[in-house]
Regions:
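Nucleic-acid enzyme cleavage-core boundary/entry regions
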Residues: 1-61, 71-174
């Protein structure tokens, strides 16, 4: 059967935390959807190297970013874009990370921790002008967060699958 390193050139699911990454590895998500899995920034090293080699050869790769709903999650796309900027538009980056409204709709608890309060001003351009985006900005400033792994594993896989699968050959968790 195919291994996790076999599906790394066309599209890659990039996880920001090990717990989420392992859920996708142990459940064989990469086999169901033919997608590479990467724990940011470079684990497994073979996958990270193949992505850079593929992009350097002039081929396109879509990187799907999966992250928690927290300050680091909201900054994750910018971090990945900076790391792949040398490849220009060949690295297509799609942010699939959880947002506060999604967490609420999925029944994921939104927690608050005063130790996570961030008095620095969050870049308003990153959040835009919509009510939902301004609400997220305020929640992040007050230390709110929601973790992906609070979803049951199969539900997390299906939620992610539904946001990536685009063709009939993408059979799996749908």
């Amino acid at each position: 059967p195919p291994d996790v390193a076999d599906y790394t050139t066309r599209r890659v699911l990039v996880c920001d935390r090990q717990e989420v990454f392992l859920s996708f590895i142990f459940n064989g998500f990469f086999r169901k959807l033919e997608i590479g899995l990467l724990l940011w920034p470079d684990y497994p090293k073979l996958v990270a190297n193949q992505i850079h080699d593929h992009l350097a050869a002039g081929s396109k790769t879509t990187l799907y970013l999966l992250h928690d709903c927290n300050r680091a999650g909201y900054d994750f796309k910018e971090t990945v874009q900076e790391a792949f900027q040398e490849h220009g538009k060949k690295a297509h980056i799609v942010d699939l990370g959880m947002r506060f409204r999604q967490a609420s709709n999925l029944g994921v608890p939104i927690r608050s921790d005063t130790a996570r309060e961030d008095s620095s001003d969050l870049d308003p351009l990153q959040f835009g002008d919509s009510g939902e985006q301004q609400e997220a900005r305020l929640m992040l400033r007050s230390g709110c967060f929601a973790h992906l792994e609070e979803l049951p594993p199969l539900r997390m896989l299906r939620w992610t699958y539904s946001r990536i699968a685009t063709r009939t050959q993408d059979v799996g968790y749908g």
